[in-house]
C-alpha cells in the first residue's frame, strides 16, 4: 500500500495538481500493467494522467453528480468533468444496475459487475461466532455519510429508546448520531463486522 500524500476527498486545485504528478511519478517507478481507479476523484486524476498509456478500469462507487447534497451548479460541473473524462481510454465498471445505466449515458466503454459475496467464507465466520445475550439490536454497515442518511438512522433510534442501534463503520457525519442508544464501532475488518452483525436482530 502506497499513500498518495496530496490526495484528498475535497477539491483542492493545488493538492490535486500535486497528486496528479505524484501518481505519474509512482507509475513510472512501479510500471503497472493495469490501473484500477476507485471513486470520482481518483477517476478524474487517473484518467487524465494515464490516457492511453496504461490499460485502465474505473469504478465510480456513486457518481458525484448524482449526490443531492450538492448544489445543482456543482452537480452540473461534476457531470461535465465525468463526460470529458469518459472520452479517455478507460473501461468503466459499475457495481449496480443504476450506476451502469448512468455510465452508459457517458460512454459505451462500460460494463457491470455485481458485488460478490464469498458465501463459504461468510458461513465459516458465522459458524465460529459465539451468540451472546443482547437487547433487540438493529445494525447498519458502511461509511457515515450523506448517502447513508445518518440523520434518519438517528431519528429512528431516538423514537425507539429500548432498542439498541449499532453503526458498523465510521465517517465524516458521525456527529449526527447523537442518540444514546447508538453504538458506533468504528472501522472494522470483515470478520469483526460479521461478528457484530451475527449478534444483531
Residue map of PLM features:
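Acidic donor-binding loop of glycosyltransferase active sites
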Residues: 198-201
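A short, histidine- and acid-enriched strand-loop-helix "catalytic/donor-clamping" loop
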Residues: 7-11, 54-74, 88-91
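Conserved donor-binding/catalytic core segment of Leloir-type glycosyltransferases
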Residues: 131-148, 154-158, 165-166
Amino acid at each position: 500500500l502506497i499513500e498518495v500524500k496530496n490526495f484528498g476527498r475535497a477539491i483542492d486545485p493545488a493538492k490535486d495538481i500535486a497528486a496528479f504528478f505524484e501518481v505519474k511519478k509512482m507509475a513510472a517507478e512501479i510500471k503497472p500493467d493495469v490501473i484500477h481507479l476507485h471513486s470520482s476523484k481518483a477517476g478524474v486524476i487517473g484518467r487524465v494522467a494515464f490516457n492511453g498509456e496504461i490499460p485502465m478500469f474505473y469504478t465510480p462507487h456513486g457518481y458525484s453528480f448524482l449526490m443531492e447534497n450538492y448544489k445543482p451548479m456543482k452537480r452540473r460541473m461534476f457531470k461535465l468533468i465525468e463526460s470529458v473524462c469518459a472520452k479517455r481510454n478507460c473501461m468503466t465498471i459499475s457495481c449496480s444496475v443504476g450506476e451502469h445505466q448512468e455510465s452508459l449515458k457517458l460512454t459505451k466503454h462500460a460494463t457491470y459487475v455485481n458485488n460478490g459475496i464469498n458465501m463459504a467464507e461468510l458461513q465459516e465466520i458465522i459458524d465460529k461466532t459465539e451468540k451472546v445475550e443482547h437487547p433487540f439490536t438493529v445494525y447498519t454497515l458502511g461509511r457515515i455519510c450523506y448517502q447513508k442518511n445518518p440523520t434518519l438512522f438517528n431519528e429512528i433510534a431516538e423514537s425507539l429508546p429500548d432498542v439498541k442501534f449499532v453503526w458498523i463503520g465510521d465517517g465524516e457525519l458521525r456527529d449526527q448520531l447523537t442518540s444514546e442508544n447508538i453504538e458506533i464501532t468504528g472501522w472494522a475488518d470483515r470478520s469483526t463486522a460479521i461478528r457484530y452483525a451475527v449478534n444483531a436482530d
